[in-house]
Amino acid sequence: MSFELPALPYAKDALAPHISAETLEYHYGKHHQTYVTNLNNLIKGTAFEGKSLEEIVRTSEGGIFNNAAQVWNHTFYWNCLAPNAGGEPTGKLADAIAASFGSFAEFKAQFTDAAIKNFGSGWTWLVKSADGKLAIVSTSNAGTPLTTDATPLLTVDVWEHAYYIDYRNARPNYLEHFWALVNWEFVAKNLAA
């Protein structure tokens, strides 16, 4: 069984003006597709062929891990975004954020700061720890919470290819616009799972 590039949950121009169609064309259409292609080539004829993406991420290393994790991370990231989204979470998610960070404003400030300070290429995550508390975690390169006992709720991609076309080297500007796209409904479903 080969992996395929999952369909975006919206049109490539749907996130504009925050993330341009050109960025989606490269980030999704080229980078994400390349990870899928590389993964398929790397697992051919190995014990990983026929396994689920999550199982491969949890049990592999090296090139197979890097490509599998990047396929998973990107798919998760696209679902964390939505057109006409943003604002603040409500219900149990809002309560959990307030319990763990004091307020939504404090969470947003801490998450943004962690993403800005995430050195080099990587991901910044909101996760639910094994004890049920929410935490902000930054990973490098293809790192993912799937290899831990934490449940990923939200992520932002801070590899330069995620924002360079629209924001050049201004990661803080990208993060400011990221908040206008956060799909809180998806994040809430992850918390409830």
Swiss-Prot record:
Reaction(s) catalysed (UniProt annotation): 2 superoxide + 2 H(+) = H2O2 + O2
Enzyme class: oxidoreductase
An MF annotation (GO) of this entry: superoxide dismutase activity
The UniProt record lists the keyword Ubl conjugation: no
Keywords: Iron, Metal-binding, Oxidoreductase
Cofactor binding: number and manner: Binds 1 Fe cation per subunit.
Keyword Iron listed: yes
Binding-site residues for Fe cation, renumbered to this chain: H27, H74, D157, H161
Pfam families: Sod_Fe_C, Sod_Fe_N
Gene3D superfamilies, per database record: Fe,Mn superoxide dismutase (SOD) domain, Iron/manganese superoxide dismutase, C-terminal domain
InterPro entries according to UniProt: Mn/Fe_SOD (IPR001189), Mn/Fe_SOD_BS (IPR019833), Mn/Fe_SOD_C (IPR019832), Mn/Fe_SOD_N (IPR019831), Mn/Fe_SOD_N_sf (IPR036324), SOD_C_sf (IPR036314)
Cofactor: Fe cation
EC number(s) stated in the UniProt entry for this protein: 1.15.1.1
Subunit structure: Homodimer.
Family the UniProt entry places it in: Belongs to the iron/manganese superoxide dismutase family.
Record function comment: Destroys superoxide anion radicals which are normally produced within the cells and which are toxic to biological systems.
Name of the protein this chain belongs to: Superoxide dismutase [Fe]
